[in-house]
Amino acid sequence: MADSQDDKLYKAEYAKSGRASCKKCKDNIAKDSLRMAIMVQSPMFDGKVPHWHHFSCFWLRAAVQSPSDISGFTDLRWDDQEKVKTAIESGGATGGKGGQKGAAKGEKTLNDFAVEYAKSNRSTCKGCDQKIEKDQIRVSKKTVDPEKPQLGLIDRWYHTGCFVSRREELIFKPEYSAAQLKGFAVLRDEDKEELKKRLPAVKSEGKRKADEVDGGVSKKQKKEDEKLEQNLKDQSQLIWGIKDKLKKFCSINDMKELLIANSQEVPSGESNIVDRLSDCMAFGSLKPCETCKGQLVFKSDAYYCTGDISAWTKCVFKTQTPDRKDWVTPKEFSEIPFLKKFKFKRQDRVFPKDAPPAAATPSSGSTTSAATSVSSASKNLTEAPADKPLTGMKLLAVGKLSKNKDDLKKFVEDLGGKITGTASKAALCISSKKEIEKMSKKMEEVRDAGVRVVADDFLTDIKESGKALQELISLHAISPWGAEVKVEAPAAAAATKSTGAHSSKSTGKVKEEEGGSKSKKMKLTVKGGAAVDPDSGLENCAHVLEQNGKIYSATLGLVDIVRGTNSYYKLQLLEDDVQKRYWVFRSWGRVGTTIGGNKLDKFYDKNSAMDNFCGVYEEKTGNAWASSNFTKYPNKFYPLEIDYGQDEEAVKKLTQSAGAKSQLEKPVQDLIRMIFDVESMKKAMVEFEIDLQKMPLGKLSKRQIQSAYSLLSEVQQAVADSSSESLILDLSNRFYTLIPHDFGMKKPPLLSNVDYIQQKVQMLDNLLDIEVAYSLLRGGVENNEKDPIDINYEKLKTKIEVVDKSSHEAQLILQYVKNTHAATHNTYTLDVEEIFKIEREGEYQRYRPFKELPNRQLLWHGSRTTNYAGILSQGLRIAPPEAPVTGYMFGKGVYFADMVSKSANYCHTSQADPVGLILLGEVALGNMHELKKASHITKLPKGKHSVKGLGRSAPDPRATVSLNGVDIPLGKGMNTNIDDTSLLYNEYIVYDVSQVNLKYLLKIRFNYQTSLW
């Protein structure tokens, strides 16, 4: 598995055997010789593996910028450290095996820079994003794509001028010259001369003169650097002197006993034992971690803790100055000459200049701000996406904008995005209406690619506004074309060859570059209590064993944000449908990808198969299969309360045959189909990053969702209290394990900011309603007399009638829709397709006591289509007690609006799915507590019955009409002259669901703007 503290792209060590072969030349790497690796994503499990190379072959594939990029560099012998440094400084040229000579005499070719004549006009300059014409000179900086490191160095091409202007940024060092570029020798003579002028080497004399200008400061710095270098050399020789003697004079058992005698944990592997022992003998025995009492271990730039702060999370403590005690050699080792003569001398370990100082991660009692308490130990943690709103997006700029190209590029990159020059690669285009009218060739490419165009003030708004990305895109869209913008997920590692089969064992496959992160669709065959995993190849001839009411099937999860892992493990005991044959099938990998593998073990008696199943389960979880109380252990999997879609087939049959015998009016039939549309539910879950393979619709338990709410409450409180990053990390790991997410190859993001936590709260709100809808669908499947649509209609326990659009009440509602469409919601218009009158069973009786309150209004409430089965069957609900309070502007209540488009925005429709549902409810507001800014209401002031958030615009009160004693504020929007409010439009909140009586349900079509004129 990937090391929890080491996420570096490269690794160096001495070969432990002579079995490994070089990935470049395919020859074996001799034992004890220096070998270098590029770390790549394993296709077999959720972690990284080294691709080893001979030292000389390595530099033909890697572009190392600094020794600190290499894990294990400081553990090398001094001479080998110098060798690596020299290779880095010379651009990877080693002069050894595989080395290449440059064009100029005595100069070596730089392996990570190249020059050539462009072979076509398809390449794009990485500096200016413009095309490089065929036969034009282009210069490349070779880099490793972090998502596909196994591909080695990849050319990133530049125009000559663009490369020259970025010389320092591209680390083309002053001492490098054009003559050292790979391919320089084959250029035409005149081009060679021109390139030499533009990319000259800076002479060393010039450097010395510059140093003299700085005077004593540079001399002093140089002296300090030389002293540090000598100290590092002496330190390396001391450590390796100890290592060599330990290997020569001590057995492995002797070394283990020495570690135990000095209260140190004994690691696995001879090299690890020697490393730890030499460190302790040189600098002193390490005291336990001050945070978790775990074992500290030296790794390249600091001492890292290998312990755990909880059963869910590894400790992230690291330091360069650990507490130590004197090394003690037990008397029984006095017969070993080396140990008898060894005299311990206390000293501190010296670190290279480029090693960042390691600050210890604050413990749970720290008062450090949560925003800044992330230690360097966890610098690679992925922050919540809300921090950089354009993360994963490529933008194209067309025409003259308010910012020049360089400023725009920096601005976009600061927001997490990238600028591209190719329309087909862009998610969004920044331009102006003038450019659209002009319709240049570039804008034609944008239109043909279907890329939405937004005005350039979109960038300013997204930086300063707290609004959602999609909402801002809709607000600033200026093109008559363009689909809903999707954020691009980083590509996974390139696919490797696989011999996957349904036999004894299969290898995994890494996703294709453009494959995104969606799990493959599987047809699940349900037999008895659970579905047989189709990857077993036995779905047609076997079933999952069920004994004493227990189904022998388990899905396990393990998330570690520090490691970047998001793993699953599936286990099933299968019994032949006819014969007495048994199999234990297991599969594993990374959630949301095809990374992983599987294994099928065959047994001829039940007891042997059960023993194997129980043994694997206990190995992976630390718990016995028969145990009733599960205990989570560090680095062990956690069982998820899910299954492979029990009742899925029955639900499909129910929905597919719907409508043939229905007694309902056609518009009501269509409404029921819409509310119970399983595909819409699945789309919603995918939108929430839920992994449908591990969390299918059929098994969204309320208990699981409520536990997830509680975790979000805890993490929200931790962020608010500026708790330690370790606590937030722990809660994040637990949340993602409980609710499996599909992040593809991205690291699971830390739940470290309020906006991202609120996104997850909204996700759980919607999952609760989806759970209700699916539970209703599964119930009452047996009735063959009634039409499935009628059965589902009855489950809602709501009387639904179609309202004639020519009726008085319908005309009032249509006027209400027309007049209260807010001016700022100008990216769509609304058409009312159907109006339904609704009457929820028992709701009027509940509402009757509040009917006596003054100020009853008919107000809007919008929600996703997938939520309406829950809303109609159970009513509008207040967020559960487990849910965090953050994100609710006026506390936990039921929210309404008097502007139709304010509520319509919560329908979450799109151009691809433009039909939504919106409610009109009679709300007993009584005496309102009026507010202009956020206030977390837990109890209303005495004499108040509701809260009104005052907006800057509202329906003209003079046009309010009454229908059966209920006010309908259907006037056109007007300025309220309230300027000191944080709300654009009014909000109404009640804190008792009994104050709501749902009256109408509207089916509305969103007409997204298709024309600018």
UniProtKB/Swiss-Prot annotation:
Residues 219-353 form the PADR1 zinc-binding domain. Zn(2+) 1 binds at C22, C25, H54, C57. Zn(2+) 3 binds at C289, C292, C305, C315. Keywords: ADP-ribosylation, Allosteric enzyme, Apoptosis, Chromosome, Cytoplasm, DNA damage, DNA repair, DNA-binding, Glycosyltransferase, Immunity, Innate immunity, Isopeptide bond, Metal-binding, NAD, Nucleotidyltransferase, Nucleus, Repeat, Transcription, Transcription regulation, Transferase, Zinc, Zinc-finger. It is an enzyme of class 2 (transferase). Residues 541-637 form the WGR domain. InterPro entries: ARTD/PARP, BRCT_dom, BRCT_dom_sf, PADR1_C_dom_sf, PARP, PARP1-like_PADR1_N, PARP1-like_PADR1_Zn_ribbon, Poly(ADP-ribose)pol_cat_dom. Residues 385-461 form the BRCT domain. Residues 661-778 form the PARP alpha-helical domain. The modification PolyADP-ribosyl glutamic acid is found at E413, E435, E444, E445, E464, E471, E484, E488, E512, E513. The active site is at E987. Gene3D superfamilies: 1.10.20.130, 2.20.25.630, 3.90.228.10, BRCT domain (3.40.50.10190), Poly(ADP-ribose) polymerase, regulatory domain (1.20.142.10), Zinc finger, PARP-type (3.30.1740.10). The keyword Nucleotidyltransferase applies. Poly-ADP-ribosylated on serine, glutamate and aspartate residues by autocatalysis. Auto-ADP-ribosylation on serine takes place following interaction with HPF1. Auto poly-ADP-ribosylation on serine residues promotes its dissociation from chromatin. Residues 284-326 are annotated as: Zinc ribbon. The keyword Methyltransferase does not apply. ADP-ribosyltransferase activity is regulated via an allosteric activation mechanism. In absence of activation signal, parp1 is autoinhibited by the PARP alpha-helical domain (also named HD region), which prevents effective NAD(+)-binding. Activity is highly stimulated by signals, such as DNA strand breaks. Binding to damaged DNA unfolds the PARP alpha-helical domain, relieving autoinhibition. A motif (Nuclear localization signal) lies at residues 207-209. It comes from the Eukaryota. GO terms for cellular component: chromatin; cytosol; nuclear replication fork; nucleolus; nucleus; site of DNA damage. One of its GO terms (biological process) is DNA repair. Zn(2+) 2 binds at C125, C128, H159, C162. Poly-ADP-ribosyltransferase that mediates poly-ADP-ribosylation of proteins and plays a key role in DNA repair. Mediates glutamate, aspartate, serine, histidine or tyrosine ADP-ribosylation of proteins: the ADP-D-ribosyl group of NAD(+) is transferred to the acceptor carboxyl group of target residues and further ADP-ribosyl groups are transferred to the 2'-position of the terminal adenosine moiety, building up a polymer with an average chain length of 20-30 units. Serine ADP-ribosylation of proteins constitutes the primary form of ADP-ribosylation of proteins in response to DNA damage. Homodimer; PARP-type zinc-fingers from separate parp1 molecules form a dimer module that specifically recognizes DNA strand breaks. This is Poly [ADP-ribose] polymerase 1. The gene is parp1.
